[in-house]
Amino acid sequence: MEKPSLDTIVSLAKRRGFVFPGSEIYGGLAGTFDYGPHGVVLKENIKNLWRRMFVEERDDMYQVDATILMNPRVWEASGHVAGFSDPLVDCSNCKKRFRADHLEDANTCPSCGKHGTLGAARQFNMMFATKAGASEDEAATVYLRPETAAGMFVNFKNVVDSFHPKLPFGLAQIGKAFRNEIAPRDFIFRLRELEQMEVEYFVRAGEWEKSFEEWLDIMHRFANKLGLASDTVHELEVGDGDRAHYSKRTVDIEYDYPFGRKELWGLAYRGDFDLSAHQNGSSVSLEYQDEELKEKFLPHVIEPSVGLDRTFLAVLLAAYREDELGGETRTYLALPAHLAPIKAMVSPLLKNKPELVEKAREVRAELRKIHPAIAWDDNGNIGKRYRRQDEIGTPFCITIDFDTLGETPELKDTVTLRHRDTGEQERLTIAEAGERLRATLS
């Protein structure tokens, strides 16, 4: 099938409770979206997979959760106060504003088409500033963090002093970041409030290449576990002129979105730039004491950076399917079972038959001993329930009918188990249905 359009995904995401426009009843706010009940669970499942693969399966990782508000000197040292900006131009005719580096023609307004109406470029800092405490003076200015990485760098010394890790080791963090984007767009791809999952991995200067390849492999395995087809995920080796001046290598992991091939994640070798900047800015030594070699030095850093919202969008796009079933076109999300917000739905064939409802609730209670995400759905006829669960990405629908109760004696205590991806149904005992669920989730 053809790849779904962005509008198709946006519609499904709202219809099935994955993502809603932010502040919708007030007309919304550009660059903001709220995650609904199923979106929250899917997002948590993505986080848990990342945490397992990037942190828990390793012996050299330490998690931190740094504050969103930090001493403003942090951002001065990191260069964000002076350099976290985009060049903007204004059109004197239509009064619209544009990124200067995104214009195809620097002399023509892309909105109104007028020639010679674009002014000189000026820098616009993308950090959100606010005030700490009751004071309104300049000294009270603090920023909503534009990235999560700084929180790990400023806690480097704390972790070393508390845990005495041997190199190489890494810090990991999941958290919100805020960027005053000029033109947030493409649904949840470019947001003003976003969530990041990042690692800062500290190595000796001469050993970075091996670790870089190791993290690149982990990122590709992560993409595979998310259900992203290998032919939609690409590596872009960032050239010398486009890399940060301190980076010897940067690889962008790109994904084929409906609006083009765009950056999904990034992997960068940052040298000792960050620790050096914060050591100079704080006047506190961040050198690592190697007890075996009796050396003190600033470790170098490899940074695998994953944007959670962009990943969420890629997962929905990769899972979207349309096919013909029962003479009708249906839509379903072929989510990997470990990501699906609902693992199975249990339903009585008829909701107005107390004996069916009671038995269905018993079956659901048993299945929830295997996994808590077992949904109940008795709204509408059974066909509508199936279609609804298909669009949520539920792997199995389990129906309790009169045969379950013994109307056909040899079928007593059996259920109908329906498979999401094929629509096929099979008759299993309640115990067998539980084992099928357990095997799928293992």
Residue ranges, per PLM feature:
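NTP/phosphate- and nucleic-acid-binding module
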Residues: 1-442
